């Protein structure tokens, strides 16, 4: 691909006086930035001009004739205060810093706020996501000297998603906090998503003061029931003296049970004087499982003729990718990724077969259909990950299933199993390898034959993806035909989503992290997202909420600032969380967002196509330019309406992110064609009995 360079070609977007970039080497590619028609544009120019008054050292470089010496000296902050004193205050006062990040030891006198903060220090907390509030202000006041950064967000749902993303990429706690009442209720949806992703998120929920409980006061709410379905543990501080105890337990349980916990604190319990000791973190070491179940699994694997491994989220969370690889190589077994766990096995490995489940890999499905033994390593084998797809009911009903799960309640929950192992994916894989080492396996004799079959199935699937340029159902063919003469607002053409996804796949940088939202095009992307290392792919899992991808990726970027970060979203889901672009810009957390602008709620509209005779109700979306909105929020914006621009646009945005620390939104104009629905048995054909509705069938 040719390098992106500056260009003097004319832009096709009205209001843009200067082009952004083009590709050298004979191509006339132009990447167009959205025009900034924001009412804030003028103010932004004034702000830029104002800062131009300073020299490199921060001193005023210009003063009006006979201007007095600035009241607060010649530093930048002093000049600002003298110039605009009525309108701004100093952002913070000087604060002392802790010499180390170690928590205090031994029994000591402290305030409950100090006990709370010191317990977080003991657990290695460096970042918290939320919106400031009076309910926890006493603790918040000492976050900075404790070495803890509060990342202020636009909406608390975004904060909880950020904590989820932070936890999923780092393997450490993600922490979210908010004001009691509405600030806490705003987090419910995101905590539910974290629950289904098994993310160790600690939700800190300051509550109404104890003397006001039950009186229906301002922002009062019963906050524990809100989260009871989506937490592994809920701790309520019932005495300020127990602040450190409950805080520590919430952090311990989030890691040991791999899921969100809630710490509920009456707001008056942050104050006072207590004598306490900061507990040391307690970590539970998971084992490999029982001897009987391990031996039974080994016997099944030793006699298997066509073993297949299903690598799930437990492999990622247990840092077990290397052990999974070793086990696959010992067996010569193809490895399918669990649903939305595309980072659980490296895509470059010869035994990798791709993801199972909705919009997954045909190669993986065809291979697992031949299995006589399936080892589900760290996978709950959820419904979406095993449902029929591409016209294939591929799950091997006669195969012997070995399921390895850290959560014993998931064993045999969805699919019938032969052997269940309650164990850690890493420890179990090691134990199985040790037991298999001295054995002659029935599958040894056919390793080469199966390797050739794996290679052939993957090559066939890649060729099919290359040729699968657009959807082929009648509705999609109709809208493609209609779009032939239709121009985008910038004068280009609407692009086929599958071709777009293929081009994005080719342009992905090494070590990239990708989050996907819920929706039709995002679902189709499952076949095009491949990764080489774990903790790289984040999706809303079984909860399936919109507005997930952007804030989750902001949190992931906080945890891994050296890795490229890309969020996918459709235009419907994008509208729910795009305000967090302001969070990324304000706090210098650069990410890249790709918005598929197909002007509809695609996933649900597909049901109206299949079941309701194309009677479209509330599914159409006519939006302003998302790239333009991004510009108004201080980010960069790129509109893409030519296929050859897709890859260069992503590369340009990644360059902006990694080298200039800029957030960028790539708005890709897509046709209205639709991929297969999530499941075909989710609805039924309508039946009407009343005459006035008889035509609505």
What are the language-model segments listed below?
Residues 1-17, 22, 27-30, 38, ...:
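Low-acidity, Ser/Thr- and Arg-rich intrinsically disordered low-complexity segments
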Residues 79-94:
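Short, Lys/Arg-enriched N-terminal segments with co-localized hydrophobic residues
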Residues 96-445, 507-510, 590-593, 630:
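N-terminal alpha/beta PP-like core and its mobile active-site loop of ThDP/TPP-dependent enzymes
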Residues 113-116, 131, 139-141, 459-551, ...:
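Active-site diphosphate/adenylate-binding microenvironment
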Residues 204, 213-214, 218-219, 412-414, ...:
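Thiamine diphosphate
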Residues 253, 435-472:
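Long, well-ordered, tryptophan-enriched scaffold segments
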